[in-house]
Amino acid sequence: MLELHQFRHSPYCLKVRMALAAKKLEYRTVEITPAIGQIDIFQKTGQKKLPVLFDNETIIHDSSSIIRHLEKIEIEPKLIPEGLKEACQVQIIENWADTTLAKSIKIVFLEELTKLSLIHI
């Protein structure tokens, strides 16, 4: 069975969970505590960042690499177009979402979290 090591609130882990759901693949999650839990995953995989997918003896890290792996093990529905032009367009949008958009969301999220924590003091 597929095993997704994740931090639930990570947008990259959410991206993988959405791909797994779209493919209707069975999997189990292993919640990793930021910082402390990452030591354990680093010792197992050599990777510091999440998500990490275990597919039997195969270890895949990075949300985009995991999705490419899922495309190989479950063909339908396709998450990445077959045509070169369309696949490149998807990759450009994905790279933008993973970098520029994710950083912006993180800034807003942290600002809102700070406001909430100040309200409860």
What label would you give each PLM region?
Residues 1-119:
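GST-like domain detector, emphasizing the conserved glutathione-binding G-site
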